[in-house]
Amino acid sequence: LWRLHARCGTVPSRAEVEQALSLVSDEDILLDETARTAELARFGQSLDLGSIAKGYAADEALRILKEGGVHDALINLGGTVSALGRPRRVGIQHPDRVTGIAMGRISVENTCVVTSGDYERYYEVDGVRYHHILDPKTGYPARAGLRSVTLIGPSALELDALSTVVFVNGAEEGLPLLKEAGVDAVLVTDQLDVFCTDGLRENFELL
C-alpha cells in the first residue's frame, strides 16, 4: 500500500490503511516444519522480510568467509556491517546529511553493527516525511521519537530484527529489550540528541 502511494507521491486514506491493517496478523503465518513450507492464511496477505534480509545475508557471507579460511574482512551491506579480524572504525550515518556523512563512529572487532533509520527510504508530502518502517499497530510510519537505532552484537540477523523493534517502539520500551538481550546501542532522537548504552559510552565518538 505505502509503496504504491510512494511511487505516486500521495498518502493512503485512513480507510485504505485500516483495510490493510485488517490483514496483519502473525497468527496467519502457517509453518509446516515437516514439509518445510510456509503459507499465509488469507487472500491479499504478503510477508515482507526486508527488515532482516540484510542481516541474514551478512551472517551467511561471514560464515562462508570463515569456512574458507578468511581471517580479516569487512562486509558492508548499507546499514548492516559485519567486521572480521582487525579492529575497525564504523561510522554512524547522520540522519540529516547526505549518505556517507557520519554523526559519530565506534570501534569494533569481530562483531556486527546494524542501523535502522528513517533517512534512507522515505518520501515527503506537504512537508511531512513518510518513511518505510511501519508501525503494525497504526499502519503508518513509526513515530516513536527516534531517527535511528544502531546496535552492536554477534548476529546481524538478530540485530536487524531488534533494531526495527526498538525503532518502532521507541527508547522507553526499547531500552529494556536491549538490556535483556545484552545488546549495546546508539540511539538518535527526533531532536538529534544521541544516547549511548553504558557499554558504548567510552567507545562512541561524536563527530
Segments from the language model and where they lie:
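Mature catalytic core of soluble alpha/beta enzymes
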Residues: 1-207
